[in-house]
Amino acid sequence: MSVKWEKTGKTSGELTFEISQEEVKKGLDQAFKRVKKNLRVPGFRKGHVSRVVFDQFYGEEALYEDALNIVLPEAYAAAVKEAGIDPVGQPQITPVSMDKNKPWEMKATVSVKPEVKLGDYKGIEVPKQSTRVLVKDVDAELNKRREQNAELVLKDGKAAKGDTVTIDYTGTIDGKPFDGGSAQNYSLELGSGTFIPGFEDQLIGHKAGDDVDVVVTFPEDYGAKDLAGKEAHFATKIHEVKSKELPKLDDEFAKDVDDSVESLDELKDKIKKDLKKHKEEDAKDAIQDAAIKGAVENATIDEVPQAMIDEDVQNQLNQYLGNMQRQGIDPQTYFKLTGTTEAQLREQLAKGAAERVKTNLVLEAIVAKEKLDASADEIKQEIKDLAHDYNMDEKVVRRSLSDDMLKHDIAIRKAIDLVADKAKQVAKKATKKSTAKKSTKEDEKKADK
């Protein structure tokens, strides 16, 4: 095969290659077989036309387009391999010559991955992460659980922030009702931020039996575009006011909220361990993010092809919509309810695409330099993990992912771990504001001693 690669830019070039006469003949034969069954030629039964008759009646050139579609993918892949390039995105391939007595000549305009020159990626300084669990952290979690298990009791007085009111409301704009603007016997916790800004605040200070004219303005960025920025009046009737009655913090409470413990002390110990685990996970993520960011900043990367950015956005979009569908959410219904569009989501995903592409390029360069790979056992475990995460059969996962894809993902994770493990944690520089603060003795006590 005759192959020529000529760079036209840092990340682009033209690939000229030939498709041999032998391959062209195979493509023409396959193309004829595909069209033969539907051919109608005077004097012949449908599907019983010979190749000679076809060429006389239609001309061999009538098969060229189908034949090219058949042989081109394999020929292009072979040319890419021989040229030693790493293309991204879809090439634009144009026939230069398609003579039946000569090899077909093609020219492809191709985007390629940019060159990456690694800088320092070991020993990168990252902010030191604390995994201490303080008494106040445990207390905050206990209070959260008390809130979650609170009972609502009728209240005679005025509604306050944190109380729950049962209301009827009818909304109008310019005196006319609008879709979704009315409800009966709706339970609303004041201060929860469930309704648009200002609605809940105007119910505070009122009691059961009161009629309240709530006047609010929908935010300019409100999901329903027909309501955004408009003033609305809600005729609101308060039926009842309830306040939260928090459960007593004792052994019985502990057993009620967690059947694996027998006392409040056991619950506190368990909360400490859980918080410790979460803080360690958060610290690991923070170190990884900071270390990888440093490695990317230290690297030199040629311009990133738009094709790579477009591909990243499409992959992110596919993943986002796929997760929606796995959760039983129809994407079109989601867009309708949120007042957004797929184009807006794509635009949002595009904001971080260039940085994501650069990060992946640097990690791939580290994989190559460190000669990171994946063993057969690691690939098997990866398939098991993916099947578990997505609730799929292992065989289905295996069929949908190639070894190269699995090896790539595993090697990238190894590169992330390498950069993070070699990072140096350094104390965060104290600001005037932070040094001026005085910690209480309670906060100084570690709950994980």
UniProtKB/Swiss-Prot annotation:
PROSITE patterns, alphabetized: FKBP_PPIASE
Domain comment quoted from the record: Consists of 3 domains; the N-terminus binds the ribosome, the middle domain has PPIase activity, while the C-terminus has intrinsic chaperone activity on its own.
Location of region: Disordered: 427-449
Gene3D superfamilies: 3.10.50.40, Trigger factor ribosome-binding domain, Trigger factor, C-terminal domain
Record EC number: 5.2.1.8
GO terms, biological process: 'de novo' cotranslational protein folding; cell division; chaperone-mediated protein folding; protein transport; protein unfolding
Major localization class: cytoplasm
Localisation: Cytoplasm
A GO CC term attached to the entry: cytoplasm
KW Nucleotide-binding (keyword) present: no
Statement: the UniProt record of this protein carries the keyword Mitochondrion: no
Annotated Pfam families: FKBP_C, Trigger_C, Trigger_N
Basic residues composition bias: residue spans: 427-438
Function description: Involved in protein export. Acts as a chaperone by maintaining the newly synthesized protein in an open conformation. Functions as a peptidyl-prolyl cis-trans isomerase.
Name of protein: Trigger factor
Keywords of the record: Cell cycle, Cell division, Chaperone, Cytoplasm, Isomerase, Rotamase
GO MF assignments: peptidyl-prolyl cis-trans isomerase activity; protein folding chaperone; ribosome binding
Family, similarity comment: Belongs to the FKBP-type PPIase family. Tig subfamily.
